[in-house]
A protein has these predicted regions:
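A generic "structured core" feature
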Residues: 1, 9-10, 19, 98, ...
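Conserved mid-domain beta->alpha element of the FAD-binding
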Residues: 1-12, 134-135, 161, 191, ...
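A structural signal for isolated positions on well-ordered beta-strands in alpha/beta enzyme cores
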Residues: 6, 101, 201-203
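Conserved N-terminal helical subregion
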Residues: 24-166, 209-226, 364-374
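Acidic/histidine metal-binding catalytic segments
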Residues: 42-45, 230-245, 304-309, 322
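A short coil-to-beta-strand element that immediately follows conserved catalytic motifs
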Residues: 104, 155-157, 174-178, 199, ...
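Active-site substrate-recognition segment that forms the wall
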Residues: 177-212, 218, 222-231, 251
């Protein structure tokens, strides 16, 4: 789309955590438009559907059909992806266009801007300048702090466990190409296949008050994890036993921003709309942001500040709804009614009735980054 971009990454190497993510049709639509959809699909898994299951009985409700149904309904697949594979595909795409366009070991410390340029100061004492600065620097965004001041992250009261399970470690009947949300009082478990069914991604979320480490790399033990989900269905226990090394982290929230941009600087992704991972839209929203921003920079006439304002206007309400929808799912997945067998059945049947599911997901999946008005 005609933008000459330099990427400054503080990590010394491009290495993603070993975890999965879900890319619904609104995300894969952008990746196909960028020409990397098929490359990623070849490394991923196209689940046939998603299910809701009760935490202790395993009783099941359909969440929605995927696979060919997603392609037929939305024009693009719903992929479950190993995060390092997505990073590799995107990195190769950038380097095909600009071999030296990614600068590793380059941590941004501060920036200044004037009417003509913006200058980024790096931790090695050097600085670089350009027409615009895009802060895609995550939940601890330096760019956000400089633009809008410090804001303290708040603990949501939820910890999450993650792990990657080799599919061969699971009983054969569990090696299914579906995604499952196990819902229970005060917690839930999500799992889905990765890498053409060779791996299973596991995430378990639990309401707790005694763990506030935000790092993704805090190791736990399978014994701790099993204790946290004691009494849950045997299939959940089987997955926990099969995880080689589980990790845990605290889910933190930051106040939403009423605006993202100032003159030549703007934000993207978690830097401006971090969300709890209960709508499977965090990565997708960042992909959408990037595509819409590129369109704004190349399609909108006028000064740069106007281009960034139009990008922000196109994205603010949608990302706000995604943040709120993710938070709403905490109560939906963890509802106290799920503790009682009879109430749980009625509750799940009502909450995941077809019209309710459609109201929560159709507006997400049908969004088209190539056509949205900017």
């Amino acid at each position: 789309m005609g933008c000459d971009v330099e990427v400054y990454e503080q990590a010394p190497e491009l290495k993603e955590v070993g975890a999965g993510l879900q890319l619904s049709a609104n995300g894969t639509r952008a990746l196909y438009a960028l020409g990397v959809g098929e490359e990623l699909k070849a490394l991923s898994c196209e689940a046939t559907g998603k299910e809701i299951r009760l935490w202790n009985t395993g009783e099941t409700w359909k969440l929605f059909d995927l696979g060919a149904v997603s392609v037929e309904r939305y024009g693009c697949p719903y992929l479950t992806v190993y995060r390092p594979d997505l990073l590799d595909v995107l990195t190769r795409a950038v380097r095909r266009l600009k071999p030296e366009g990614i600068h590793l070991g380059s941590k941004g410390l501060a920036f200044v801007q004037d009417p003509e340029r913006v200058e980024l100061m790096l931790d090695d004492g050097s600085s670089v300048s350009g027409d615009a600065l895009i802060g895609a620097d995550g939940v601890h965004s330096m760019v956000r702090q400089v633009l809008f001041g410090q804001d303290k992250p708040q603990f949501t009261g939820i910890i999450a466990w993650r792990g990657i399970v080799p599919m061969g470690r699971l009983p054969r009947h569990m090696a299914r190409m579906v995604g499952v949300n196990w819902i229970g009082p005060g917690g839930h478990v999500v799992h889905y296949p990765l890498r053409a069914g060779k791996l299973m991604n596991f995430v378990g979320a639990l309401e707790r008050r005694d763990w506030r480490v935000e790092s993704w790399s805090a190791r736990g033990t399978t014994e701790e994890l099993a204790a946290d989900f004691k009494g849950w269905h045997e299939e959940v226990q089987a997955m926990i036993r099969a995880i080689p090394v589980p990790y845990k982290w605290a889910l933190m929230a930051r106040p939403p921003l009423p605006r993202w941009s100032a003159e030549r600087v703007t934000l993207l992704g978690d830097a401006c709309h971090s969300m709890v991972p209960f709508l499977a839209q965090g990565a997708v929203m960042a992909i959408e942001d990037g595509f819409v921003l590129a369109r704004a920079l190349t399609e909108v006439a006028g000064p740069l500040a106007e281009k960034l304002r139009r990008y922000e206007k196109a994205r603010l309400e949608r990302t706000r709804r995604a943040v709120e929808g993710s938070a709403d799912n905490i109560h939906r997945f963890h509802n106290p009614a799920l503790a009682d067998a009879a109430q749980a059945r009625d509750y799940a049947a009502r909450e995941w009735a077809g019209q309710n599911v459609a109201s929560r997901y159709e507006w997400l999946f049908r969004y088209d980054v190539t056509k949205v008005m900017i």
